[in-house]
Amino acid sequence: MANLATGEKLKNFIGGQWVESDSGKTEAVPNPATGEILAHVPISNREDLDRAVSVAKEAFKTWGKTPVPRRARVLFKYQQLLVENWEELARLVTLENGKSYKEAYGEVQRGIECVEFAAGAPSLMMGKQLPDIATNIESGMYRYPIGVVGGITPFNFPMMVPCWMFPLAIACGNTFVLKPSERTPLLANRLAELFTEAGLPEGVLNIVHGAHDVVNGLLEHPDVKAISFVGSQPVAEYVYKTASQHGKRVQALAGAKNHSIVMPDADLDGAVNQIVNAAYGSAGERCMAAAVVVAVGEVAEPLMEKLQKAVNEITIGNGLDDDVFLGPVIRESHKQKTENYIELGEKEGATLVRDGRKDNVSKDGYFLGPTLFDNVTTEMTIWKEEIFAPVLSVVRVESLDEAIQLTNQSEFANGACLYTTNGSSVRKFREEIDAGMLGINLGVPAPMAFFPFSGWKNSFYGDLHANGTDGVEFYTRKKMITARW
């Protein structure tokens, strides 16, 4: 593990060994809250990736035939080690990502839950059998692992998203090559250390740090059979098209613009609490963030009054400090991009209720306070595009029909939420909203690991979603056997 006090150079994890990249290139990994250099991550090349894939391919010959209960026992041990190191993992998340320690602690919990699901997944790997499909003939379906799987993960959930991928893939008998975000590489290396301690054989999990060369290498390598990706919409589309053209199974989870509809009969205090947490938690850098509030009818004025008050009370600072809610964004470049969106929102006619650019926290960190817009319309850029930052837009409409129509105009469809006490409104919302994950009176309707993370439209590219039974389907292939006895 890197010495965080000296900014030590990180290494790739290939074949159970920590190895230097052949490229000789590195990139600094700063703490977003302080600018302090935590480590230097290698920007690996194709040769590094080829070595990892070759090792994973060789390891698959044994791991793919390892009895399922034995694989599950390694995962149960891994889960135990993650629990024992919970606080350390949460601190690492905060150091390299910037989110508050409380949120990081919750992220580690979600990652552990993914490992728990993977450890218990053998019951979902069972096949099916039907005797006597004809006289003295029986037929059965069996599941087999697919081989070497590649995973490409983002900076915003350095614990949870990798744990969506490699534990379940490995439980299903595959081997794995992970390319974590070069912005948050520390947590990935620690996950590999703990998995090795749990008894995972060499070569089953490999980590290659880097950027475009490693990504393209995974997408094009003939020995990589499937790709799981989480990231922005343009990159997700590229990953899906490129990997598909090279004959791979692909799931690519993309961007979002999640809408929250607030009805006049809603519990406003509860709605505001949920919306503020969903919009500004993790600095808005998550694909389930609340990005747009749709205020229906006469609820708009009292809702705006309560929202403004709640947003003004948000505490900003280093995520390791007590009582901090909003940490920094990931990099200075992302801060500047977000500030440009805020400026554009003003120019296009939105009402800037609270300007996060005016919050003075620290000149060394990448801090941006919570921003709140009112009177946003669907013609504005800040409504159309994913900002991925602590910016919330409020749109005013007159009816639930109008709110649903507006929400469905978005090219993204990860999630949507409704705040109401009326069952008829819930039923209408549930049936008519074109999005994959819906919340009723809660702000982040992300499912547990045993359900699929089911984005729609331009929020997802592929057929089988991450997690749940979809995940098992994605990481296995079926073989039909028909026999006469």
UniProtKB/Swiss-Prot annotation:
The gene is iolA. Pathway: Polyol metabolism; myo-inositol degradation into acetyl-CoA; acetyl-CoA from myo-inositol: step 7/7. It catalyses: 3-oxopropanoate + NAD(+) + CoA + H2O = hydrogencarbonate + acetyl-CoA + NADH + H(+); 2-methyl-3-oxopropanoate + NAD(+) + CoA + H2O = propanoyl-CoA + hydrogencarbonate + NADH + H(+). The lineage of its organism: Bacteria, Bacillati, Bacillota, Bacilli, Bacillales. Belongs to the aldehyde dehydrogenase family. IolA subfamily. This is Malonate-semialdehyde dehydrogenase. Catalyzes the oxidation of malonate semialdehyde (MSA) and methylmalonate semialdehyde (MMSA) into acetyl-CoA and propanoyl-CoA, respectively. Is involved in a myo-inositol catabolic pathway. Bicarbonate, and not CO2, is the end-product of the enzymatic reaction. GO terms for molecular function: malonate-semialdehyde dehydrogenase (acetylating) activity; methylmalonate-semialdehyde dehydrogenase (acylating, NAD) activity. NAD(+) binds at residues 155, 179, 182-183, 232, 386.
